[in-house]
Amino acid sequence: MDLAANEISIYDKLSETVDLVRQTGHQCGMSEKAIEKFIRQLLEKNEPQRPPPQYPLLIVVYKVLATLGLILLTAYFVIQPFSPLAPEPVLSGAHTWRSLIHHIRLMSLPIAKKYMSENKGVPLHGGDEDRPFPDFDPWWTNDCEQNESEPIPANCTGCAQKHLKVMLLEDAPRKFERLHPLVIKTGKPLLEEEIQHFLCQYPEATEGFSEGFFAKWWRCFPERWFPFPYPWRRPLNRSQMLRELFPVFTHLPFPKDASLNKCSFLHPEPVVGSKMHKMPDLFIIGSGEAMLQLIPPFQCRRHCQSVAMPIEPGDIGYVDTTHWKVYVIARGVQPLVICDGTAFSEL
């Protein structure tokens, strides 16, 4: 109303000004055409300008969206350094063929025989290269050249006298032995839903799982608003994480302070055995297939046996790392999900 009244008053004043200009023009002897031209120029210069229409609600919506976009962009750049690295790029067609030809050439080498997935056993020593795993025995160790009369050093007794035990869940020991390596076949792999839940709840305890920013946020949104690692989060209860992801540990003889470090997503290598992943004393196969290798210290190799055995989803392994070096090799077609931790709080 005020704007309309203001415009009316302006036009009234302009009308009075036009009449005054017309009278003055006639008095000065100007022609009618010259007077009209002068009035037209006057009106064009003094025409009131109507301000553009304003939509306050739309402006508020624009500001809110711009603020949210800025917050998400800032959060992304803050989180990105703490996110796991993306997997290696897929090889092009030319690289794939070159890798295949290189793989075929390597198959003829003697060292390649011990990593061949077609063999049921993994030979680790000299003349036993062609020795397969027995069908009834899930693991195999190589024969070491040991002199019975030669005394065993004190730091080699752990690997020389405590051999790897492979057992079913119902046969698991009731008492935990620190020096005794063992593999417990639970037959309980991680389901995809359990892995996804773990990724949402504990993103800082994962490695190698690559997923887009918004895809991960959308998948975890109802359960968790911010499913990404951030530095100001309080320390995780890793013992609780272990038993939450693997409830079977409540029935096993491991110490109560056994904890979970991280879960990793590993791709099988084009050349079987070309990449070995070092493990701590406690590890669990969530999904996929792998080969376990236990190698004694160099000074103990005359008294201790190297061990190699295939492990499968649901297998729980424990090895005292003071007497063994523990390695896992991803094999097969499916990616390997493996979780590692420790049975002792001091590690």
UniProtKB/Swiss-Prot annotation:
This is Bombesin receptor-activated protein C6orf89. Keywords: Cytoplasm, Glycoprotein, Golgi apparatus, Membrane, Nucleus, Signal-anchor, Transmembrane, Transmembrane helix. GO terms for biological process: autophagy; chromatin remodeling; collagen metabolic process; connective tissue replacement; epithelial cell proliferation; fibroblast proliferation; positive regulation of cell cycle; response to bleomycin. Homodimer. Interacts with BRS3. Interacts (via N-terminus) with SIN3B. One of its GO terms (cellular component) is midbody. Glycosylated. Named amfion, after 'the 4 Amfion heroes in Greek mythology and their deeds in different locations within the mother land. Residues 1-58 are cytoplasmic. The chain crosses the membrane at residues 59-79. It comes from the Eukaryota.
